[in-house]
Structure formats: structure tokens, C-alpha cells
């Protein structure tokens, strides 16, 4: 079967009136066909080699730019297959096969596939944008599309986030690009915002010095920018102080809890009251009227 197919393939290089040729003419045609096949194979082999070489060069160059490994691998594979398609078309042209119809067929197929997979292609485009513009990296804390957690992986079609309660959430890249992205560790430092309410009867300077003592005792609080401790507002039931220290972004959640607890302990130690809203309810009893009931 294979021999017959090969024979038909060789016969395609000959004209329809092959049997009218003499032996020398047939020999010349066979040599010409063999040379075309050899040149086509050479083009194909060179194409494989150059495609692989170009893939390695692109991957090596992209690794120096600190891009995500997922994008580097994707770019390398795309360059490899695109160049391979070019050499395959050249190989067919060398064999005398009309490539214009083949290119048109490939174009139509690409269009049909694109229309069928437009959602997936949008996710691919989103993945490329995420990596190129470096909105976030693997291991960073982000919040997007109502999901908050640590980035586990950035793939071509989707991004996986591990929430704080250890759930894995996979979000399509198209949805990420179309929503606001909050990167909690995008900057080296981050500010903790605490509102501490104390009673109106408390001495303001005493409260401020107590809060400052708590901040000074924590060596992980940044000295630059300097922390802010100020009377922020007079509330309905408390005097509210704004406590705003700066910490390393990766320590934000842990230090926020530590400082909140330390402030509560210090205020208790200094007998500084922390009021809470109270509501007094006054009941007004209506006056009762005596009714004369007369017997009928």
C-alpha cells in the first residue's frame, strides 16, 4: 500500500502522456522528481532546526527580562510553530504543489476556529497582557473580581488564586483584565489604618502618648515614612484617634492584628476607657382613665 502511494506521488511529477516518452526522458524526469523531493526534505529539516534554534533564542532573551515562566514558554512555542508552518509551505512549493489554495484554506480555518473559540482567545489575550504589563506575580496578595488571596499560578487561559481559607479559585484572564486589580504587595511598604475610640473624659495627651508607646515598642514598624497618631474626629460616643503606622507589605496583615491587640492591652493598663454606643430607652406610660360602668 505504501509503495503504491509513493508511486502515485512520483507519477504526479510526470505529464499525462508519460508513456510516450523514451527511457532517457523517463530517467530525466525521475532524477528531477528525486531532486525536488530531496530539496523539499532538506528545507523541512532546516526548518525544524531553525525553528528549534529560534525558540531557544527567544526563551533565553525573555528570561533576562524577568517575565513570568508561563509567558516565556508560550512565546517560545508560538515562534516555533509559526516558523515551522512557513517552512512547511516552502516545502510544498518546492514539490510543485500549489500553496495559494492551501494558504487560503488555512486562513479560512483560522477564522472559523477564531470565531468558535473567541472566548478562549480573549482569555489568551488577557493572559498575555497580565504578563506583559506585570500587574502581579506568583506569590503576591491580590484582590480581583471579588476574590482575595495569594496568586498560585498565571496560565495562558486563567489565573489561580489561593484564598486565605485555603481554597483554590480559578479566574478566566478575560474577567481579570475587565475588573479592577488590587495588588496588596505592589509597593514595598503599606500603611495600617486603625481608628481607636476613647471616652470624652480621657486626657488627650495621655491617650496620644500611650498609643505612641505601643508603636515605638514594635521594631517592625517603619520609621520612614513616620507613623501618624492624631485626633481624627469627635464621634457620637467617643473621641477617635487615627493610628497610621507604615510596615512592610508582606507583614501588613500580621502586624495589624498584633498592633490592635497591643493597643487594647495598653489602654487597659492605663485605665483609658474605650466606650461603645449606648441607647437609653424611655418608656412613657399613658394616663389611665377610670370608666364608670353602670349596670344596665
UniProtKB/Swiss-Prot annotation:
InterPro entries attached to this UniProt entry:
LSM_dom_sf (IPR010920), MS_channel_1st (IPR049142), MS_channel_C (IPR049278), MSC_TM_helix (IPR008910), MscS_archaea/bacteria_type (IPR045275), MscS_beta-dom_sf (IPR023408), MscS_channel_2nd (IPR006685), MscS_channel_C_sf (IPR011066)
PROSITE patterns per UniProt: UPF0003
Provide GO CC annotations from the record.
Answer: plasma membrane
Tell me which UniProt keywords the record has, alphabetically. Answer: Cell membrane, Membrane, Transmembrane, Transmembrane helix
The yes or no answer to whether the keyword Transmembrane is present is yes
Q: What is its main location?
A: membrane
Tell me the protein family, please: Belongs to the MscS (TC 1.A.23) family.
This one is known as Uncharacterized MscS family protein slr0639
Q: Which organism is it from?
A: Synechocystis sp. (strain ATCC 27184 / PCC 6803 / Kazusa)
The major lineage groups are:
Bacteria, Bacillati, Cyanobacteriota, Cyanophyceae, Synechococcales
